[in-house]
Amino acid sequence: MGSIIQDVTLTPLRTISAPGGDVLHAMKRTDAGFTGFGEAYFSTILHHDIKDWRRHLRMTMNLVVPLGSIRFVLYDDRTDSTTHGAWMQICLSRDKNYQRLTVPFGIWMAFQGLAAPSSMLLNIADLPHEPDEAERRPLDFFKFDWKS
């Protein structure tokens, strides 16, 4: 369940300790995974909550967790992928695994808040939000044990 899905990348990020507060790198336009800029937004998730499955049709997401801890679960059902049918899960946090997760369009993803009271993610997307650009499914659409 921990293998990398084709075209999904993990990029270690730098934290710079500074008096009065640290600097957390997220992305530069010269970084791998940068495919353009559409919008950047923060999203919070409560401890133990899980956001439903979604798959973007054109958007590439670059996800960073600067606060708390989030488990991301990805499923590849792209028929032309070398990892068709593969699952991947990764927990990201500032303290234990500060990396950027790049998820291309066509990959199903859901995520769970692991830290109390809440966690925060930053999505640096190559497209602005469009309501019809993503497909959504309920959590029980794919058989995944969120308690494991």
List the predicted regions and their residue ranges.
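Non-catalytic, conserved peripheral segments adjacent to functional cores
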Residues: M1-N97, L114-S148
